[in-house]
Amino acid sequence: MFKLISDTSCDWIKEYAEEHNVTLVPLYTTFDGQTYYKEQFEISYDEFYRKMTDENAFPKSSLPSIQDYVDAFMPSVEAGVPIICCCITTYFSGSYNSACTARDMIIEDYPDAKITVINSLQNSASMSLFVYEAMCMRDAGYSYEDTVKKLEAMRPFGRIIFTTESLDYLTKGGRLVKTATMITSKLNLRPIIIMKGCLLYTSPSPRDA
């Protein structure tokens, strides 16, 4: 048995994670650069999207602190339970680095602690499935070591395929270049967007009918 921990990039709601004994470490969100909210703990996904649509607010995210991870790890470390921590791709966030630093700090005082931090190479929907697979292996009785091996092998294969009415938020967030947004807008196109290996690609799509 092992403890499963994930940052909130997996898009699980807090209640679902608690029901399935998965600890969430929140990323932070700000709309004004001054007030930061812990995702799922101080602002729900519904509130997040309502601010974007009703207030036309553009969010920015920040990684969990090292202390956030220390606080999440310590109960299991003190109980002698191995930990698997799944983190958003390092291409989008420094969450993995915070978790690794927290692990290294803890191991100085608890050298026998078993803490594996995984750079999932995923985000959002594919990260959700990654954590779900880890949970299923835990519940099926897979060992800590076997689960780590299988998760490491899964990392390169996640994909997200989606489309959206507007590319504005992806452009503002630096995920797509402005030229692509301008062209698709003028031609009234909704491109198919693929996230693969931490990068976004666009595929040709029919015009919006």
What positions do the PLM features span?
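N-terminal glycine-rich anion-binding loop in soluble enzyme alpha/beta folds
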Residues: K3-S62
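General beta-strand structural signal in soluble alpha/beta enzymes
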Residues: L4-S6, C85, T116-N119, T147, ...
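Short, glycine/acidic-enriched loop or turn micro-motifs at the edges of active sites
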Residues: C10, Q122, D208
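Glycine-rich phosphate- or other oxyanion-binding loops that anchor nucleotides, phosphorylated ligands
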Residues: D54-A57, L63-F92, N97-T101, V148
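Active-site histidine-anchored catalytic micro-motif
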Residues: I88, S95-I160
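Internal, active-site/partner-interface "lid" segment
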Residues: R138-G197
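Single conserved hydrophobic/aromatic residue that forms the stacking wall/gate
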Residues: Y201-A209
